[in-house]
Structure formats: C-alpha cells, structure tokens
C-alpha cells in the first residue's frame, strides 16, 4: 500500500511562523505522529506532500523511508495528491492521510484499507452532533454514497446531514491518477477537491465503502491553537488511561503530561503536575512527587523523587532519594541509596552508593565515592573560564559545610574536610584538611543605627 500524507497547508489560523504540521503535540510535531501511524501499516511507499515551509518540514521529519513531493501552490487536496503520484506504486492502493490529524488509530486505518480491497473506493466517515464546517456524505435511498459535498457548496438539505467526510480515503492508484487528472475547480473555493473523485469513481462503476472510527476524536484536525490544546488534552488523557490500565497510580489522571515515552514498572506512583519528556524509565516501586519535570532519565527500583525536582539526562539508582527542589543535569549518576536534597544541583557527576548531599550544593564534573557526606554549601569549582576540570572524592569522606573544591583535585579515602575549607591541592587518605584561620572578638563595638527620617 502507498500512503500519502498531505502537509502543505499554510495554517493561517495558527497565527504562527512555524508551519502548522510542526506544532508540537505531546512534545513532537503533529506530522511525526501521523508518520508513525503510517509506518505501523508497513507501506511500500510513504510520501509527504509539503508546501508552506517546505524545507523546514523536510528537515524536521526526514528519514530513509520518507519521500517528499512539493505542492508549490496550495490549490486543494486533489491537487496535493496529484503531486505525489509520480512517487507511488500504481499497482498498490493509496491511503491518503493528513499531517494535522494526528490521533487516528492504526486499527481504524487498517479496517478502512481492508474494506477497500478489490478495487473499492474507501472513505473514513464520522457522525457528529455538530457537523458545521465539514463536507457531508450524501447517500441515496438505498444508503449508497453518491457524492461528498463541501460545506460551502452544500444545499440547505445537505447541511442537515450529520455524517461527515474526514478526508481520509483509500483508492486504487492507477484509477486515482486518472480521476485526479480530470478534476475541475468549479466550486466556491476555486480548488481541486479530492472529494470530487467520489463521483468519478461511482461513474466508473466503483463501489464506495465507508467505515467509521471507534472514537470521534480520532479524526479531529488542528486549525487553531485552541484545537491544538483540545487535542493535547485528549491525547494526554489517553496516555494517562494507558498508564492506569498498566497499574500505575496517578494522583490525578488529568494532571500528567507525557511528551515522549514513559515506561513504568509495577507499583509506580506519580503525583500531580508532573511532566515526562523524551525516554523515561521508572522501575518497580518508584515514587514521583508533585510538580516534577523528568527528561531522558532512568530511575531504578524503589527510588523516590520528591516534589519540584528537575531531572534531565540523569540516572538514579535503587532506593535513592532526590529532592525536594533538586536538579540533576545531564550526566548525573546517583548510585543505590544515594541522597540529593533540596537546592542541590548535580551535573556530569557520580554520587556513590549511600552518599548524601542534602542541602544547598553544586556538584559538577565530579566523581564521588561511596558513603560520602557532603555538607551544606559545598561547591566543586570546575570551570576556569575556558576549561572544565574534575573533582575526585573517594569513599568515606566527610565534607563539612561551606567547602570549595578547586578542580582538578583529588581527596583520598576517609578524609575529613573541616567546615569552611577551600581544597585546592590533593589530600591523602585519612587526613584532616582545613584552612588555618584566626577568629577575633572585639569588645566595645557599636553597631551602626539607621537614621530615622
């Protein structure tokens, strides 16, 4: 089967410089969702028709299995499909999809394709309570489809029809090519409508078959930011329902956003207002607190991420604790039972098994061993304005509060670092390191008093 995806429209009502089909749904372009659905049908040819913002669209979805046809002028859906014909296999039927209709299920399309075998012309229709704005399916008294009429060209009687055309069709390609070549544009829009092919197919003796999706939202398209927001909520609720069915506990299914792939083990619990981006894995027994953002991360069994924490490109070990208000940046690796607490930032650094940094700390470009206690206010000074350097802290080190490690520096196993110390030289194992300081107390000091105006 050939699949053609129409993605050339300008999307004026989006009021955006970004081509409509590149606006994100669940963190990915609308068009990418449609391409993924098409791929699931294993087409022999997959062609995307581009026009407005053509090079931007091409760059966003380019792949070895995707071919592109260009519609230089947007002269209607029939004209758009015509641009793809040279790239199609004429011996295979062609399925036409739309780059701004992202939620159609693969099973729905397969059902349509199966119904349209043996030289039938298949149309996906849906019945709406309010069909305003859509082309109507006109049938004769026997229930056979006789034509599809667009809203602007419909008579008052036709406007009362509630079965509408979704635009998604399957047709025999060789005949489709002939029918498209014979299309005219004598209509209110002055465009070449793909829907007008139906009358030609009927005249040629082809049976018009229709199928409907299981859910009306499968055929909803995007023409405005309001419609995009509506589809986002529908899609996110579908994802939430799938998580619930898999045994994940969601504090509120309406308040989770998945913008990528979220894989969960058993007994995972997710509180409200959490966002998951990219590929995220939550193993058995993981708990995610409220208002967390987790991107491209793997969190091992029994770990806990407390509220308002941000994880990006991080790996969290079994039974580790993160947050609240912690930030793990790319390259952060927490071993089993490690703790990273409030207002701690970890970047391109490892924190060994059972090690803890519970308060107000920056650990960047560091290798920290097991059972290390990092006191509040500790900073690894890893950047000299041009280059990054690493700090190495071996097992069983105790770091007092308000400590700075000026990299490159290595602190040996079992070292104790006194509070307020700046460490700029390597320290051998089991040493106490501190900076000599004097403390002076003066009597008779009078604190300045602000003058009253």
Swiss-Prot record:
Keywords of this entry: Acyltransferase, Cell shape, Cell wall biogenesis/degradation, Cytoplasm, Magnesium, Metal-binding, Multifunctional enzyme, Nucleotidyltransferase, Peptidoglycan synthesis, Repeat, Transferase
Localization annotation: Cytoplasm
Pfam family for this entry, one: Hexapep
Cofactor note text: Binds 1 Mg(2+) ion per subunit.
Catalytic residues, chain numbering: 359 (proton acceptor)
Class in the EC hierarchy, top level: transferase
Main localization, broad class: cytoplasm
PANTHER family found in the cross-reference section: BIFUNCTIONAL PROTEIN GLMU (PTHR43584:SF3), NUCLEOTIDYL TRANSFERASE (PTHR43584)
Family of the protein in this entry: In the N-terminal section; belongs to the N-acetylglucosamine-1-phosphate uridyltransferase family. In the C-terminal section; belongs to the transferase hexapeptide repeat family.
Protein name as it appears in the record: Bifunctional protein GlmU
Organism name: Burkholderia pseudomallei (strain K96243)
Taxonomy of the source species: Bacteria, Pseudomonadati, Pseudomonadota, Betaproteobacteria, Burkholderiales
